[in-house]
């Protein structure tokens, strides 16, 4: 009889567990442009507050210094309810993110 109550309590606890709101997230906007072989851009937004956009281009085409240059941003709502945003550049100098919540290099 005790085991029945323990099992019943476990089942009730599992049924009462909060659902993951991100599990039901859907893409609400998607845009992409890849028509030019030396340039691309795309952006995505989801129903749970995630947003991402990026554009990239090949610079110094045909030269010894040819390199990819990428600019983008992303944002998401953290578990604390705060929206975190990051803007970044990625090029021959590496990945360079900036955001209010990120430390600044000296």
Swiss-Prot record:
One Pfam family from the record: Chitin_bind_4
- Any signal peptide, and if so, which residues? 1-16
One function term, GO molecular function aspect:
structural constituent of chitin-based larval cuticle
Which PROSITE patterns does its entry note?
A: CHIT_BIND_RR_1, CHIT_BIND_RR_2
A cellular-component GO term for this protein? chitin-based extracellular matrix
- The chain positions of domain Chitin-binding type R&R read 37-106
Q: Which UniProt keywords are given for this protein, alphabetically ordered?
A: Cuticle, Signal
Q: What is the purpose of this protein?
A: Component of the cuticle of tobacco hornworm.
PANTHER family from the entry? ADULT CUTICLE PROTEIN 65AA-RELATED (PTHR10380:SF218), CUTICLE PROTEIN (PTHR10380)
User: Which protein, by its recorded name, is this?
Assistant: Cuticle protein CP14.6
* Organism ancestry: Eukaryota, Metazoa, Ecdysozoa, Arthropoda, Hexapoda
As recorded in Swiss-Prot or TrEMBL, the protein's gene is named CP14.6
């Amino acid at each position: 009889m005790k085991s029945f109550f323990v099992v019943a309590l476990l089942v009730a606890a599992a049924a009462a567990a909060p659902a993951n709101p991100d599990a039901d997230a859907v893409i609400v906007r998607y845009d992409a442009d890849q028509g030019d072989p030396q340039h691309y851009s795309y952006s995505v937004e989801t129903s749970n507050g995630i947003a991402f956009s990026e554009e990239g281009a090949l610079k110094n085409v045909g030269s010894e210094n040819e390199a990819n240059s990428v600019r983008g941003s992303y944002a998401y709502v953290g578990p604390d309810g705060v929206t975190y945003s990051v803007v970044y550049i990625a090029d021959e100098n590496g990945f360079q993110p900036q955001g209010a919540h990120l430390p600044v290099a000296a």
